[in-house]
Amino acid sequence: MAQGKARETIVSAPGKVLVAGGYLVLDPAYPGLVVSTSSRFYCHARSETPPSSPKSPRASAYTIIVRSPQFVDAVWVYQASTVPATTPSKDNEPKPNWIIEQTAESREKAGRNPFVSLALAYTLRLAAELNGSDELEALLQQTGPKGIEITVAADNDFYSQRETLNLPEGTAPTVDQLSSLPPFSPQKCRISDVHKTGLGSSAAMTTSLVACFLLHLQAVVPKGPDSLETEDLALIHNLAQLAHCAAQGKIGSGFDVSAAIWGSQLYRRFEPKVLQACLDEGEKVFTEGEETKQEREARLSARIELLPVLDPYNPLWEASSLSASGESQSTATEGLAVSSSNHQVPKPAPLQLPPGLDLLLADVDAGSNTPSLVSKVLAWRKDKPAWAKQLYNVIAASNQGLADNLLRLRLLHASDASAYQQFVDSTATQRSTEWDALLKTLPQEAKDDQSSADADASDLDLRVTHHTVLQALIDVRNSLRSIRAGMRELGQRAGVPIEPPEIGSLIKKISDEVPGVVGGSIPGAGGFDAFYIIYLKSSQSPRDLSQLWAQIHAVKEEAESKLTLGPLLSRAGGAKTTSDDEGNDGVDHSSPLSDLFKKLKASEQAGQDFGLRLEQTKSVKGLKEAIARCA
């Protein structure tokens, strides 16, 4: 029997950790530092063109199936079809409306999943606008009776693995136990019942799904086997923001979707009103037969074109450092990104952890209702605007200090990578509480005389000495301490546990007593479910994750903490590099800093591709087997 021609598309997107900027990041005046993770969400789309045969009649609907191999009853089946337009478009040519409906059987068994259904619905609409409805239908016609089959799968760290490992209540998994699990482990529950770890699973899933589906519909075409143009990445970002906001029923801060596209960054929120008209449409995916003809006509008549809104060059997507009150909190990181960019497409300033620093994530066996925390803080800010403004500015200064000091470390590494790593290695063996005394014993060489043209550059001592590297690490440590203090104050003022005392005291003890730990905090909106630690990695005496966790558990036992802490295997990811990052150092070539910025950009572009990524099945361990479980 003749075989059809199969076509596959695979995309992955990383999770995130909001290291600094919780609550403040909702206001464009204040940036947030977002670190992407090594844990990723994968989306695989497959369709098969039937063998050539006499022309078949036009189908009335086209099947789209989305499956997850990790959850019980996680199969969502949809039918895509066109509905004749009841009102003319701008060019007076009636264009059919594309809709999707969930099958009744799928609805009964799997339930609704707005993150999946709205991602598909908006992507289908945008593809029709980009390529034309006829071309889209011709492509779907070629998918045959099986339609498009999509598999979504997440790295294990997105979900708590306590039940997967059959651990007794109050027992946390070990690094070895987590490492022994197969990739994409089944969770033994429905998706609505899973315990998440706060890495941004819904944003990573939504982003990978819209990217994969848009690529599979050939509305966006890669410029090579594994890369996308900056404009296409920005378009996918905007589409994912829309789908994610619609699924949540509100316009959120957007940093999690941004991290899923651009990787680690200094994030500043887009103008929220850019999406308001789209959300006002009330896009919804119904079950077949659930919506009457009159209701559908009324709903579809309110639709607007998506492309003008989602256009990468729409100025409303350009983040502004000015708030509604005219306040501004700009950073050196953003200034460098603007000066070194060739492109007009809005995208965040890349900022990743410097070499020699990494992120440790702890899963706490408790939970926080993030929307409740956020609503209470926003209510306090509205009730006490003067207090809030003052406190927000104090926290923002600490956040800015952290971002700029991390950039300073990256510049020191770019100046002399070997000497930099040598000094990081020696510092990694000592507790952060000992660093200040050590600094006083180190010689501080006088700066060479510099011309007035280099006066701004001379404000930063970029000579790589033990003193300059240690001073920068101390400044990062102090910024993390200040951020924690500010967030504690915010929680006390608003009456919410942004940093619960039992977690805060443990973070302090770990930061003070475990050698090489720079500091830590509670990510995002805070609460009881997680915390992070930033620590130094020694190239001479490396600690594996098990050794580091043994040190943390020793501190926890000494503190007689009752918290149940579990490790995550995820590490810090980097910033995405794009085509417009190449060939521009952002500095006058006559400047002595020109070579330094070239080295900095070269180090950012080295290694693996971060952010949104095109994949091959064979390159992702366990993905082929996970897809097969869905068959």
Which positions does each model-derived feature cover?
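C-terminal nucleotide
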Residues: 1-20, 24-26, 34-149, 153-195, ...
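Residue-level detector of functionally special positions within alpha-helical transmembrane segments
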Residues: 200-202, 256, 524
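DPxDG-like acidic metal-binding loop motif
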Residues: 198-223
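Active-site pocket scaffolds in enzymes
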Residues: 528
